[in-house]
From Swiss-Prot:
Family statement: Belongs to the D-alanine--D-alanine ligase family.
Natural source organism: Staphylococcus epidermidis (strain ATCC 12228 / FDA PCI 1200)
Top EC class for this record: ligase
Biological process annotations from GO: cell wall organization; peptidoglycan biosynthetic process; regulation of cell shape
Gene from which this protein is expressed: ddl
Upper classification of the organism: Bacteria, Bacillati, Bacillota, Bacilli, Bacillales
Protein name: D-alanine--D-alanine ligase
Amino acid sequence: MTKENICIVFGGKSAEHDVSILTAQNVLNAIDKERYQVDIIYITNDGEWKKKDNITQEIKNTDELVINDVETGEISQLLSKGSLGKSYDAVFPLLHGPNGEDGTIQGLFEVLDIPYVGNGVLAASSSMDKLVMKQLFEHRGLPQLPYISFLRSEYEKYENNIIKLVNDKLTYPVFVKPANLGSSVGISKCNNEEELKSGITEAFQFDRKLVIEQGINAREIEVAVLGNDYPETTWPGEVVKDVAFYDYKSKYKDGKIRLDIPADLDQDVQMTLRNMALEAFKATDCSGLVRADFFVTDDNQIYINETNAMPGFTAYSMYPNLWKNMGLSYPDLIAKLIDLAKERYEDKKKNKYKIDY
């Protein structure tokens, strides 16, 4: 059987750089190397692209993926041809956060006319920006918790007015979030005005725009979505925490979470969550994969929190485990995502790019 040549891209200029490397390690160890010949491109924190061909060995430590012993390559040349001597069948970007999950690199792949796994430019960018995402959800009629958003420049000029607005519109606790980061980077749970000001200062280190959301005592439920024009969903899973707030440290370092799959919910609530996940997928014009995150209260009120256009594939990650519960193994999930990338690319080729006069 002729192998398909795949390129996995990871790292990147983002606060989620290390998460991306961890995700790449997991995917490289799971991908079917009998079916795929896998090259890798590591993007350093400084934005340099470094490539290695035909990765066959198990990656035992993430340090093995920090490539320093090759020269920085010219981007279009690195992506133009794989180690099998032909164009890549697909590129698999495993980049989290700005410059990778936000539509930036997806635009590059579009310009270079390369099939790639995951969401397109519009879906990636709108799912990355929490304010834009919330506005699209609102237009679709999806229930959300109250929130406030503002820019760093606005806060510098109108700090007192903004603090008053938060105190008037929301009740503590609230969550302060950079608008364009994931993996809970820069997020703070604030129980009073002093913590609010500290959380705002922290979040503005990572982004020029913030979202402050109403806190709620609710269960955190997640649904995985997979597909292009006709997506499928999983049964919901629940994030059960041994900490007050599911932050970056508890997600990736401490292991202080448990994933209950499937979640212990009434059947009708589970079906509502699956349908809402599909609506969220459509609201941001997604393709490939999405994880939709929800809050569910004790009386089964449901609020959508966000969609994640590039959910992690680490050992702690909900997305692959949700599909495993549906009978789709990790290697088969990776293969399905690559097939979806090629399917979308072939569909795009049906478009006309010139007008016949």
